């Protein structure tokens, strides 16, 4: 991902304030509610029958935390996202058969959740930087598919 020094600074400064547990669960939960077809990859998670069930599901929260942990790792390797996410790309492609479009959807949901949590602090400039990052991560995760 090609970010200016200002964009990198904005991304890392905001990320230092992110509660990964809370934001991860909320982002994955919102993905599953807003794009219900993504639920098919989470059959083992139990009750996903209503928005409340999804948002309060402990397995959704735990996996969201795990996803955001991987995203955090990516933020420390912005110059090598393909390498950073190579194993996850292989897992999601070869074993889980996840539609790579879902990575883009989750990135966009994450941006919405960050905007909700940070309000005025999530300026248009910060959003633009995060959009670049989530697009880069989605591309890296989809790399094995190409």
From Swiss-Prot:
CDD domains reported for this sequence: Hb-beta-like
Residue numbers of N6-acetyllysine PTMs: 59, 82, 144
Domain Globin: 2-146
GO cellular component, one term: hemoglobin complex
GO MF terms, alphabetically ordered: haptoglobin binding; heme binding; hemoglobin alpha binding; metal ion binding; organic acid binding; oxygen binding; oxygen carrier activity; peroxidase activity
Residue numbers binding heme b: 63, 92
Coiled coil start-end: none
Modification Phosphoserine occurs at: 44
Keywords: Acetylation, Heme, Iron, Metal-binding, Oxygen transport, Phosphoprotein, S-nitrosylation, Transport
The family this protein is said to belong to: Belongs to the globin family.
Assembly information from the UniProt record: Heterotetramer of two alpha chains and two beta chains.
The protein's name in its UniProt record: Hemoglobin subunit beta
Species, as recorded: Cebus albifrons (White-fronted capuchin)
Top-level taxonomy: Eukaryota, Metazoa, Chordata, Craniata, Vertebrata
């Amino acid at each position: 991902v090609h970010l200016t020094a200002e964009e990198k600074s904005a991304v890392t400064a905001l990320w230092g304030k992110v509660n990964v547990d809370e934001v991860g669960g909320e982002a994955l939960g919102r993905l599953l509610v807003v794009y219900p077809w993504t639920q098919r990859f989470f059959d083992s998670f139990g009750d996903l029958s209503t928005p409340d069930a999804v948002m309060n599901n402990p397995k959704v929260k735990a996996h969201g935390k795990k996803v955001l942990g991987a995203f955090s790792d990516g933020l420390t390797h912005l110059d090598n996202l393909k390498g950073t996410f190579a194993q996850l790309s292989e897992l999601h492609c070869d074993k889980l058969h996840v539609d790579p479009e879902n990575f883009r959807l989750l990135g966009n949901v994450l941006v919405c959740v960050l905007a909700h949590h940070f309000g005025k602090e999530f300026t248009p400039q910060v959003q633009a930087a995060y959009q670049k990052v989530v697009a880069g991560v989605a591309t890296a995760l989809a790399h094995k598919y190409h």
